[in-house]
Amino acid sequence: MFDEASEGADVDALAARIAELAGFESFFVAGSQVSAFLLGVPDNGIMGLRDVVDHARHVASSTNIPIFVDTDTGFGNALNTYHSVQRLERAGADCIQIEDQLSPKRCGHFQGKEVIANSEM
């Protein structure tokens, strides 16, 4: 489980390495931060799977602590989400967060989000 005292959260490989050296037990790669860092845009569904997989690979290769990766809505339907999880596992993600929003998603900090039906879960 997430514990603020044991988990670092930031965006890049250097921050993950610093978190590890500071004694954090895990590192969270937040989608909103990656979107801002890589593309300079809000977390509104612009990032693609390749962006997230490549970034996760860089972060995972820089540290020995588990990384948790925000995958937004999984990049499509259930089959796309399955494929996304496989790609992120191969990239080194230890845990994956998948939002239950309809696609295209809205940034989690904003109002007006819609979630998928329970049957989709």
Locate the predicted segments by residue.
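N-terminal amphipathic alpha-helix/helix-capping segment at the start of soluble metabolic enzymes
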Residues: 1-9, 13, 17-22
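Active-site glycine- and acidic-residue-rich loops that bind
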Residues: 5-10, 74-80, 114-121
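Hydrophobic faces of well-ordered beta-strands that scaffold small-molecule active sites
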Residues: 6-12, 27-29, 67-71, 96-98
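Active-site beta-loop-alpha junctions enriched in small/polar residues
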Residues: 11-13, 32-33, 72-76, 101-103
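Catalytic cores of alpha/beta
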Residues: 15-21, 69, 75-87
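N-terminal glycine-rich anion-binding loops that anchor highly charged ligand groups
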Residues: 17-36
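Active-site-proximal loop/short-helix segments
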Residues: 30, 34, 91-93, 98-112
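Alpha-helix-loop-beta-strand connector modules within alpha/beta enzyme cores
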Residues: 40-69, 91, 109-121
